[in-house]
Amino acid sequence: MAKITPRTLSGFMELLPAPQQQLERMMDILRKTYALYGFTPLDTPVIEASEVLLAKGGGETEKQIYRFQKGDADLALRFDLTVPLAKYVALHGGELSFPFRRYQIGKVYRGERAQRGRFREFYQADIDIIGDGKLDIANEAEIPSIIYQTFTRLGLKRFQIRVNNRKILNGFYAMLGLTEQSGDIMRTVDKLDKIGPDKVRGLLTGELGLTEEAAGDILRFIAITGSNQEVLTALEGYRGRNEVFDAGLTELETVVKYLAAFGVPEENFAVDLTIARGLDYYTGTVYETTLLDHPEIGSVCSGGRYDNLAEYYTDRQLPGVGISIGLTRLFYVLGEQGMLNPQLPTAPADVLILPMTAELTPAIQPECGPSSTPSRRSSRPR
């Protein structure tokens, strides 16, 4: 019989015992940190009905998910942990206490091209806060402040949480008369770090059909940089021209104020107008976290505010805010930096306990010495 050559599919992770223990220890740090802030663990199915996952994912999501038929059922593997959470809260909302704070660490699946830092199967570690009817903006600052504490406990120092607000972007695009194209523009701008401004300009004028003037206005706007206060001051120059923009700017100023109050150093967070997030369900504050020594890896932690994600499953208003660590990507980066303990044993136990039968004792006596002989006292039942 011909033998099948064993192999691991591209983009899927399979670890030896020692690195698997390192990954488990990272997860333990995350669990303890999340629990410290009052988040409860949750698990949701890996497989969902396709209509659940695609309710508000946008065209990019449909291209990436693993989708299949089983009998008459149209099914898919989850591509993140946020959409299943929205379904869960809509389904079980009558049995939950709000605001509902949950964390989840689990595998997700995306059919993208496997490359360094990008996987088809990978762990995400999420925290989310869901409100009933309303959710105070202070939560939008608490979430990234917890990520600051989490990364610090993992031994990371040179990282930056970049913050923006999608209302600012939507309001600015409305000023340009581009309201109907705002979603497509944000998904295009979200590619800036990967493809650069020239290619983004080409997509804006080519695929989206924007004028050179409009594309230039967008690129100049998102290029506003400086200290957090300098960026906010520059944005104040646009206040009064669009209500959505004004609301987003007020929210962003509040989040920045709370982040400082929560003890997050300014070198670890920055207002960045290029941050848009590609998923359609974000409505307010958005985040991306990068490792300053590894910008080529991209974001290792991202998320934001979503007001309407549960509307496809219930009429109840369930606004939320959350953030997700790309744990698999972060694990490999820490390994490359030598920040994972290479001396971990390949077995979890320090001591092996064997049954001391008459047949076994002569075999192990030469290795263990006289002290290994069981005493009559220790063998008595108690």
List each model region and its residues.
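Polyanion/phosphate-binding surface patch
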Residues: 42, 46-75
